[in-house]
Amino acid sequence: MSYPGYPPTGYPPFPGYPPAGQESSFPPSGQYPYPSGFPPMGGGAYPQVPSSGYPGAGGYPAPGGYPAPGGYPGAPQPGGAPSYPGVPPGQGFGVPPGGAGFSGYPQPPSQSYGGGPAQVPLPGGFPGGQMPSQYPGGQPTYPSQINTESFPSYPVFSPVSLDYSSEPAAMTQGTQGTIRPAANFDAMRDAEILRKAMKGFGTDEQAIVDVVANRSNDQRQKIKAAFKTSYGKDLIKDLKSELSGNMEELILALFMPPTYYDAWTLRKAMQGAGTQERVLIEILCTRTNQEIREIVRCYQSEFGRDLEKDIRSDTSGHFERLLVSMCQGNRDENQSVNHQMAQEDAQRLYQAGEGRLGTDESCFNMILATRSFPQLRATMEAYSRMANRDLLSSVSREFSGYVESGLKTILQCALNRPAFFAERLYYAMKGAGTDDSTLVRIVVTRSEIDLVQIKQMFAQMYQKTLGTMIAGDTSGDYRRPLLAIVGQ
């Protein structure tokens, strides 16, 4: 069986970040590569990282927790939404809590990087190559000190069948975003349209949407430069003065360079009291090596802080070690598959979990943090044949809390990354209230990468289109740009 690899995807690098200690919260003049013919943008325009969380959801009630997954894989759960096509229904991925609005952003002194994770010895295989006849220990008992208020009952993916015949075309034919560079693009003309939309009394939000939601991120950077050249004003400051709430968050996110947006989001997730762990998981466990390395550099230069040290100070235990491994950006990205290694890794993972009392967490961390996604898919198939239980189910049995969510996110992305984001979007809108920050973040960050495939998986998994669910869960000026981006 072949295991098609993921083509390199993601955000284009931004090679020239400003030095540490820069005052502005957005790239200052002369640092990011702006197009020739336009002067570089000034700093200080983007909203600075708040003391905690994302902007409020504009009156929506805070999203509540979802019921915990029940039992092990088997019959579909009644009422649940399907996980991947052709497999039992799952319950999905939780959403981070909301937070306060925008506020000032401190500029602390720069910090140096810490050391990377140490090499972890792997346990050996089974004696004589034979599998244990029973699973010793049964269901693990989780530590009693875990605070259930800190670990709400978020839904998680149901384990999936390893039938790769149901994989979408995106797995073998590349992925596509819904936003493409506009033809006959004229930055000066677009700048003039935006100026007229914000001039005088009132704001023409539709004109803003027509421009912003139909230009690529690179074209938006050119529009910003053209706006300052033509009018001597900062476009971002003008937009902030004219917009508010979720509409403001969405439009400003679209104008941030992708690497900066990820770094800015990570800083917000760890700023102030509390940590948005699921935001850390969503970014660090799904990005490519190049994207992660660019995020680390941008985080240091923009905020004068070391990402790894912030992770260490805001997380702990095996979850901390997993995220530190992720922020190294050292996953093997070779698209070929070593089937012998896959078999050996499957045995090691079994012996580190189901095949012993307790769990060797370091073995799971090492394999899931270093192997390529095609290699992990082969390992998952070998594990399923060997253990008569899929690896996602075993992770659920052996781990709990955010480390479980992080490990499962890696495996879910190895199987089908668009399906992972489709489920995140579904549970951001399911039930009372909307997790608008998750909705905005995924729609914006995937709009030029794989939002086409995410839409396809969403419709296949939930029997409704992404646009239909967005239209029913949002309203007004905020709804229009979201629908324009997803292609409704």
Curated annotation (Swiss-Prot):
Keywords: Acetylation, Annexin, Calcium, Calcium/phospholipid-binding, Repeat. Residues 1-49, 71-150 are annotated as: Disordered. Interacts with PDCD6. GO terms for cellular component: cytoplasm; nucleus; plasma membrane; vesicle membrane. Residues 5-20 are annotated as: 3 X 5 AA tandem repeats of G-Y-P-P-X. Residues 1-18 have a biased composition (Pro residues). PROSITE patterns: ANNEXIN_1, ANNEXIN_2. A pair of annexin repeats may form one binding site for calcium and phospholipid. It comes from Macaca fascicularis (Crab-eating macaque). Calcium/phospholipid-binding protein which promotes membrane fusion and is involved in exocytosis. Residues 89-102 have a biased composition (Gly residues). The modification N6-acetyllysine is found at K233. Annexin repeats lie at residues 185-256, 257-328, 340-412, 416-487. GO terms for molecular function: calcium ion binding; calcium-dependent phospholipid binding; phosphatidylserine binding. This is Annexin A7.
